[in-house]
């Protein structure tokens, strides 16, 4: 219900969803908690939080570096503890996880979904799991009332876009371009055709990700028909550039979010 309530409220206000991505535990768990609280108080629509992984193949150099920083002290138990603290801090904001398949399957699929439900998580996106393998997780997601998010890529066939639209809950993660994550000066591709195809199959909101780093990108995404954006690399870069000064980091994050939301 948290995603539904969020999108209904934004629609009434004629606003786009703005969802930031950061890696849990980057640069450490204490700062990570403060970073995410700053995102919430700055007015973001929802959260997309990554579980650090040793081989994040879908990510570019900026987010890869955040995984490596977090991995110095990361653990599943600490991730779950931080998620509980965030849910206690704010009972209303939608919390989504972005994880790699190996982490989930090594933990145990059903156990993982049960655990994150207990932590107050709303959705999961598995970065490196193709749609064809969806049955490996859908039953556990449904059992524990976790919304499973799937990716719609520019190279996908119409059939695959249909599958992504029909099986995604909460929202559909729509890629602005192929390749890996990373901030861009311009949005390289027009995703309007993909978004139009997705909306023909399902009313589930389509969020645009990969390369979102400027307010102009959000305006472009709205013109393409997207319901919101996910922004990761530009935000994680601020963390990377202020590792020696927490206060400066939080102020710059606050300023960045304030400049992106409209």
From Swiss-Prot:
Belongs to the TrpA family. SUPFAM superfamilies: Ribulose-phoshate binding barrel. InterPro entries: Aldolase_TIM (IPR013785), RibuloseP-bd_barrel (IPR011060), Trp_synthase_alpha_AS (IPR018204), Trp_synthase_suA (IPR002028). The keyword Transcription does not apply. It comes from the Bacteria. It catalyses: (1S,2R)-1-C-(indol-3-yl)glycerol 3-phosphate + L-serine = D-glyceraldehyde 3-phosphate + L-tryptophan + H2O. Transmembrane segments: none annotated. Pathway: Amino-acid biosynthesis; L-tryptophan biosynthesis; L-tryptophan from chorismate: step 5/5. This is Tryptophan synthase alpha chain. Its EC number is 4.2.1.20. One of its GO terms (molecular function) is tryptophan synthase activity. Pfam families: Trp_syntA. It is an enzyme of class 4 (lyase). Tetramer of two alpha and two beta chains. Coiled coil: none annotated. Keywords: Amino-acid biosynthesis, Aromatic amino acid biosynthesis, Lyase, Tryptophan biosynthesis. The alpha subunit is responsible for the aldol cleavage of indoleglycerol phosphate to indole and glyceraldehyde 3-phosphate. The active site is at 48 (proton acceptor), 59 (proton acceptor). The keyword Oxidoreductase does not apply. HAMAP family: Trp_synth_alpha. It comes from Helicobacter pylori (strain P12). One of its GO terms (cellular component) is cytosol.
């Amino acid at each position: 219900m948290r995603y539904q309530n969020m999108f209904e409220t934004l629609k009434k206000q004629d606003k786009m969803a703005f969802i930031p991505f950061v890696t849990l535990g980057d640069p450490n768990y204490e700062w990570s908690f403060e970073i995410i609280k700053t995102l919430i108080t700055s007015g973001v629509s929802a959260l997309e939080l990554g579980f650090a992984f040793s081989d994040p193949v879908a990510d570019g150099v900026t987010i890869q570096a955040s995984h490596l920083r977090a991995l110095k002290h990361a653990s599943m138990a600490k991730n779950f503890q931080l998620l509980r603290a965030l849910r206690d801090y704010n009972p209303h904001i939608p919390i989504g996880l972005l994880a790699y398949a190996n982490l989930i399957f090594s933990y145990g699929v059903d156990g993982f979904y049960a655990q994150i439900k207990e932590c107050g998580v709303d959705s999961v996106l598995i970065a490196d799991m193709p749609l064809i393998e969806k049955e490996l997780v859908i039953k556990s997601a449904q059992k524990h009332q976790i919304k499973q998010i799937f990716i719609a890529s520019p190279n996908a066939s119409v059939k695959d876009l249909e599958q992504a639209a029909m099986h995604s809950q909460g929202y559909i993660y729509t890629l602005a371009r192929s390749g890996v994550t990373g901030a861009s000066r311009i949005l390289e591709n027009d995703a309007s055709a993909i978004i139009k195809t997705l909306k023909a199959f399902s009313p589930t909101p389509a969020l645009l990700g990969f390369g979102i780093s400027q307010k102009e990108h959000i305006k472009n995404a709205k013109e393409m028909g997207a319901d919101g954006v996910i922004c990761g690399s530009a935000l994680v870069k601020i963390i990377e550039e202020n590792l020696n000064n927490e206060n400066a980091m939080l102020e710059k994050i606050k300023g960045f979010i304030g400049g992106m939301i409209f």
